[in-house]
Amino acid sequence: MREILHIQGGQCGNQIGAKFWEVVCAEHGIDSTGRYEGDNVLQLERVNVYYNEASCGRFVPRAVLMDLEPGTMDSLRSGTYGQIFRPDNFVFGQSGAGNNWAKGHYTEGAELIDSVLDVVRKEAENCDCLQGFQVCHSLGGGTGSGMGTLLISKIREEYPDRMMLTFSVFPSPKVSDTVVEPYNATLSVHQLVENADECMVLDNEALYDICFRTLKLTTPSFGDLNHLISATMSGVTCCLRFPGQLNSDLRKLAVNLIPFPRLHFFMVGFAPLTSRGSQQYRALTVPELTQQMWDAKNMMCAADPRHGRYLTASAMFRGKMSTKEVDEQMINVQNKNSSYFVEWIPNNVKSTVCDIPPTGLKMASTFIGNSTSIQEMFRRVSEQFTAMFRRKAFLHWYTGEGMDEMEFTEAESNMNDLVSEYQQYQDATADEDGYEYEDEEEVGEEDA
């Protein structure tokens, strides 16, 4: 079967990961000890995408958990689903990365990385036909960003032909956890552009907004935010785990979504999102799902798709529904909002239909869009980076771990290049000659 190896790193990654396994366990009818409690044969049919079956009939997640301090791991282990993971797959240090990318990437993380890679190899050898890796981490801290990107580049060396999918939590525009977030995020993006195949961009502020505005939660906790993320994560891989009329996998997703190799940062959304109280007053229909799924308020990162254009998009529907209706709705969206799609990629929305809905819903959909407006995220981080870097603020923490200022300059220019590439394709039209591009690029860079 096409297995996926799940890796979670740092506090944020481990908390998202924990929630994700709760969701996947519920979908496959597996209880917190790894026993199967479900009632539907389909739950077990391809359970080995995410689980290994142990000799005693228990299902063990194909998960590698890493962190540079024991805190989050301890609370994970004592939590409801703590007993389900294989004990050897917890890899942690004692010192912590202290929100310092250099510690995660070059010093503390580098000491721990070999033991993580051993676990990854063991898990990969357990697979019949490994499809790829999914990594949960944040880009603002030290471990998820520094050590996470180190692990991604090492895995890339060892498994160059396997898909590498990341769920990356970007620093939020208004809410900041640490002062050095812009540094950590820029250094991470520099790595992700080169070494990841697909990055799902998330950020806390957009998730707070969804909890606040749509779900009507007055004081959303990280648990609520992570629940949103895990619903999306489960939606991305549902076709691998359950039978469907139109299947897709990580590679098909990449082929359909990535027109240019560097532009692989996606916005994600999930529908239906309704507040707990008003759920019973609504019947779900494909048009309703589609409408909510394409809504800008539904995007889990703080960039507005209306400020850019979609290069490509993918919609994954789950539940019993007619593919004809799905196709009609997708064509409808493209026709009504044609100005928001680039005209030089015709039919740029791929749809997937999986027959089994998520737990507790009749139908649901997951949205993944490759929109040029994601540059807003990069631009914002880049501005904050430049403001601090110009004065060399906080740099001694990084140079003290052996980093060079040159690396910062490279990361900064790579990020700015990424922004101007998005801008260039946003402005491009179908009938231009190649010559005009070059002028445009120069203009674009001056604007930027």
From Swiss-Prot:
It comes from the Eukaryota. Residues 429-448 are annotated as: Disordered. One of its GO terms (molecular function) is metal ion binding. It is found in: Cytoplasm, Cytoskeleton. Keywords: Cytoplasm, Cytoskeleton, GTP-binding, Magnesium, Metal-binding, Microtubule, Nucleotide-binding. Its main location: cytoplasm. InterPro entries: Beta-tubulin_BS (IPR013838), Beta_tubulin (IPR002453), Tub_FtsZ_C (IPR008280), Tubulin (IPR000217), Tubulin/FtsZ-like_C (IPR037103), Tubulin/FtsZ_2-layer-sand-dom (IPR018316), Tubulin/FtsZ_GTPase_sf (IPR036525), Tubulin_C (IPR023123). Its cofactor is Mg(2+). GTP binds at Q11, E69, S138, G142, T143, G144, N204, N226. GO terms for cellular component: cytoplasm; microtubule. Mg(2+) binds at E69. SMART domains: Tubulin (SM00864), Tubulin_C (SM00865). Pfam families: Tubulin, Tubulin_C. One of its GO terms (biological process) is microtubule-based process. Belongs to the tubulin family. Dimer of alpha and beta chains. A typical microtubule is a hollow water-filled tube with an outer diameter of 25 nm and an inner diameter of 15 nM. Alpha-beta heterodimers associate head-to-tail to form protofilaments running lengthwise along the microtubule wall with the beta-tubulin subunit facing the microtubule plus end conferring a structural polarity. Microtubules usually have 13 protofilaments but different protofilament numbers can be found in some organisms and specialized cells. Tubulin is the major constituent of microtubules, a cylinder consisting of laterally associated linear protofilaments composed of alpha- and beta-tubulin heterodimers. Microtubules grow by the addition of GTP-tubulin dimers to the microtubule end, where a stabilizing cap forms. Below the cap, tubulin dimers are in GDP-bound state, owing to GTPase activity of alpha-tubulin. This is Tubulin beta-2 chain. It comes from Lupinus albus (White lupine).
